[in-house]
Amino acid sequence: AIGQIRATLNRSRLGLVEAARQSELDEDANLLIVVDQFEELFRFHQTHKGTSNEQAGFFVNLLLEAAQQSEKRIYVVITMRSDFVGDCAQFRGLAEAVNEGEYLIPRLNRKQRKAAIQGPVKVGGAQLTDQLLHRLLNDIGDDPDQLPVLQHALMRTWSYWSKNEDNTEPLGVLHYEAIGGMERALSQHADEVLADAHSEEEKRDTRRVFQAITEKGGDNRGIRRPTRLGELCQITGADHETVIRIIDRFRVPGCTFLMPPNEVALTNDTVIDISHESLMRVWVSLKRWV
């Protein structure tokens, strides 16, 4: 079924519409297509040449044609970081479509940030001290990608607390500081994973893996560069077993620095990517490598 859908999509600019026709959806059904992290298409467009550039444009045309036709009730939502909106002009018709339906998501205010902190802790059946809550609120900062950093810091604080304290005690500042705080938690965690390498050679190969899947743009902005596992072996010069061991180490549960998730089996065609751009901004070692 997937192969048939792919063939339909590749047939023409109306591929999405045709796929909807061939589906088992009711005639009057609404179909919502959501493309998250759309800015990755710009990275793909810039770092691949020839047919890949054509694929990027074709993908955009599929979305535009589906959204603009009236035969089927197809709606398209794309999400992207606001600093990439200008890149939409690379594709004919995309900037116009974005202008017609743009919605800028405002940053969370302090009350919303408080809820984002307390909610997961409450779901886990625990509490945090008022001192830690205020410390977290003050440490979050204003960077657009700071929420994933907060999420990671909370996860690490929770992990440290659950291993070292009676679960009747609330999460406190001491637990938070033990994992490096907001500023260093992610970087410290990544360095701990790096330190688990079997040898200095494997640390070198780890550096080469991350150098292969990340880069800096002309504006010094970190750019993800997803790469197939087989290509990573060629780029790093490391054997297949070593590269898989490196990738697995950085994607175990509670350590999701690399994608795909841990439950996905790896093959030479598996695309390896970092889980979030914030890793390029926060991990000190990676900033030094790239």
Where are these regions (language model features)?
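Amphipathic helix/helix-loop-helix segment enriched in hydrophobic residues with interspersed Lys/Arg
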Residues: 1-290
